[in-house]
């Protein structure tokens, strides 16, 4: 079983959901970013969803765009991100690691090289945000060749045919988008049909469902689980903690530890 498969099996046995934080690697710099990831794991993160800094992130709101800019302004590249992942994997051999990034990064220099580096450094799954499931075959084949699980987004307007295709192609976990738009901790509304989407995904035997977009409070984690999700992803709320504590790493890590601990506690019934 993959690390994600093992994680969800273990959580199910404990009647817990997954809490998965998202951060942009190398924000605000390499060493501080690694300490941030150590803090996430130490305080209950079940898995990691990691972004590579990119100049034109499509799905990201202003908070994560700023994180990308900080990392890029520091001179950090894809090479530094893979170096960081290798360091994470060395210290945490069991933690599932998923990447969330744009297709442009996968093609540099080639898909094959990218997924090979993922495998070599310890990545488990990759979600390419700007590749719709209808155009996925090329990427899933390249990922599978190197033992990397492909993850796809289920949008709130997905029809039954799309849901069935997502369920067939997605491995590791299914990323259920709470609402249309870009990432943001401010916009915490979710689509009214999420319960129907979740039911349809489960009927189609999808990979475990993680709800993302606008997850910033423990109540929202509980709500996601009550709807039938297997866990929740929180990104913008975490990156905002980083943003407002750039002048104090001690304060940043302290605030982050409290947030993650509270969010993880919300996954336990």
From Swiss-Prot:
Location of the active site: 49 (proton acceptor), 60 (proton acceptor)
Catalysis: reaction(s): (1S,2R)-1-C-(indol-3-yl)glycerol 3-phosphate + L-serine = D-glyceraldehyde 3-phosphate + L-tryptophan + H2O
Keyword Amino-acid biosynthesis carried by entry: yes
A cellular component term, taken from the record's GO annotations: cytosol
Keyword Disulfide bond attributed: no
Keywords: Amino-acid biosynthesis, Aromatic amino acid biosynthesis, Lyase, Tryptophan biosynthesis
Similarity comment text for this entry: Belongs to the TrpA family.
Function, as annotated: The alpha subunit is responsible for the aldol cleavage of indoleglycerol phosphate to indole and glyceraldehyde 3-phosphate.
Stated name of the protein: Tryptophan synthase alpha chain
Taxonomic source organism: Actinobacillus pleuropneumoniae serotype 3 (strain JL03)
Gene that this polypeptide is encoded by: trpA
